[in-house]
Amino acid sequence: MNLTPEHAQKSSPMSWTVGGKTLNSRLLIGSALYPSPQAMQGAIEASGAEIVTVSLRRQSAGDQAGKTFWNMIKSLNCHVLPNTAGCHSAKEAITTAQMAREVFETNWIKLEVIGDQYNLQPDPFELLKATETLVNDGFEVFPYTTDDLVLAQRLVEAGCNILMPWGSPIGSGKGLMNPYNLNAIRQRFPELTLIVDAGIGKPSHAVQALEMGYNGILLNSAVALSPNPITMGKAFKSAVEAGVYAFDAGTMQERDLASPSTPVVGTPFWHQH
């Protein structure tokens, strides 16, 4: 392929801006559930992720293990995305977010307000309430939400520049259970930053979401619970790159019937039809 100057100057498809930061990895990764701190560090480095999610509860433990964990996170030179994991009300999430801003010195917050302990589904009412307050308080809210289009609209109206709909319940590894809904959100908000959060279990799930036009992937369990987290981190790095480049290139149109890929010119006449 001959690259014109226009093509040559085009920035890498991997480059994107989220929360005011320009990054070169579309993968956001969690810091929990790893078999050891060393496995966590190795897996995150292998994944190439530039954003790491952390829990205020983990950092606030105050013991030596908590300090070791935090020092290791800082050594990764990644942007920290604090979360409100474990919160079940807007009030609780708002308080946690405000504390996280002081501890981690960032206005980013991954907003989680869980409404059901059975499948860890977000509470849409409390999530929206917390979002409105935190946006007004100067936070860049990364809301963990469902794939409901109306809720997505309300969150955008509340001031969200980013949406993070789930692929499937947290930790389930079931991938994208409702591609139709996810695609509807993408089509409804073509310019918004969209990140699939939760349910990613395999690298192929990440590829599917990115081929759909989603901007990023947030995962934790898929890497942390792999028998080999470091190798799985590498696998997701490659998968995310494949998905982004595939979307940028554009995939072929599906056909109902076969279409020969080999031309018949020069084929012996007795093989031509």
From Swiss-Prot:
This entry carries the following GO cellular component terms, namely: cytoplasm
> Which residues of the sequence carry a binding annotation for 1-deoxy-D-xylulose 5-phosphate?
G171, A198, G199, N220, S221
Q: Where in the cell is it found?
A: Cytoplasm
Q: Which InterPro entries match?
A: Aldolase_TIM, Thiazole_synthase_ThiG, ThiG
Could you tell me which pathway this protein works in?
Cofactor biosynthesis; thiamine diphosphate biosynthesis
Using the UniProt record, give the first listed, main subcellular location: cytoplasm
Keyword Transferase on this protein? yes
A single Gene Ontology MF term assigned here is: thiazole synthase activity
Top-level EC class: transferase
Q: Does the keyword Cytoplasm apply?
A: yes
Family, according to the entry, reads as follows:
Belongs to the ThiG family.
Can you name this protein?
A: Thiazole synthase
Q: What species does this protein belong to?
A: Hydrogenovibrio crunogenus (strain DSM 25203 / XCL-2)
Name the lineage. Bacteria, Pseudomonadati, Pseudomonadota, Gammaproteobacteria, Thiotrichales
